[in-house]
Amino acid sequence: NHWGIEHWMIKDLPTYDWIHQFPGYAQTNYRMTTQFDPNASQIDTKLCMDGWFVKSMPDLNQSNPLVLNYLTQNAIWWIEYANLDGFRVDTYSYNDKTGIAKWTKAITDEYPNFNIVGEVWMHDQAQMAYWQKDSKISAIQNYNSNLPSVMDFTLHDALTSVFNEDNATWNDGMIKVYDNFTNDFLYSNPNNLLTFVENHDTGRFNEIYKKDFKKYQMAMTILATTRGIPQLYYGSEIGMAGDKSKGD
């Protein structure tokens, strides 16, 4: 989706349209739902896909065949050089959806057992499921992202709230975790979701719950025993806390 402003190629662009450029600075509106919203305006959709994430991150133009070819060749080089088993693709749902689907298919066609997880930071399972390969939801719009895995942000949302809801009502408490799993039918492959309780973008679980070890044990037990592929953030294995504003 983006590079850093100091990347050497940004300083000497191969083509003018290698990145998305505007008369002035244009930042994304972060409205990922415009990618599939039948009522979205063209302006909102374009700004979501083409706007820069922040000023220091020039937005790559995946609709440019030269860019797409470069990204594909670069990915294959890294897989071969470092003997990689998978990629995590940042801000997957901000990309040109046609271009990123072509890139993902090219990689998985070349390496059928290679896994790619996309950061689809949304809070609705139907919207997240849209981005997984062979989605029944995206098929309604004749789209297939070819992405094997997405991150289970709704499970993360539940785990970082339920253990503080001691006086749970009908819709609070552990029912949130249960409801998350009842919606697995929306995914084409729920067993290939990436599950987590914390990562580099979120608060530390033990910071949220004030280092309550029993709550940490319960969350980790759910993570270790549910469907999906669990991801441990560095320090999770020892229950590390940390203030995100001070560098966790």
Annotate each PLM feature.
Residues 1-76, 81, 102-110, 120, ...:
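Substrate-binding/active-site clefts of carbohydrate-active enzymes
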Residues 12, 74-76, 80-85, 91-188, ...:
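Active-site-proximal helices and loops of the catalytic beta/alpha 8
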Residues 39, 43-48, 52, 166, ...:
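Active-site-proximal cap/lid insertion segments
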Residues 88, 117, 196, 231-234:
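A structural signal for short, well-ordered beta-strand segments and their strand-loop junctions
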Residues 206-209:
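Short, solvent-exposed helix-loop connector elements
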Residues 218:
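Conserved interdomain hinge at the start of the Helicase C-terminal
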Residues 224-236:
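C-terminal substrate/ligand-recognition segments
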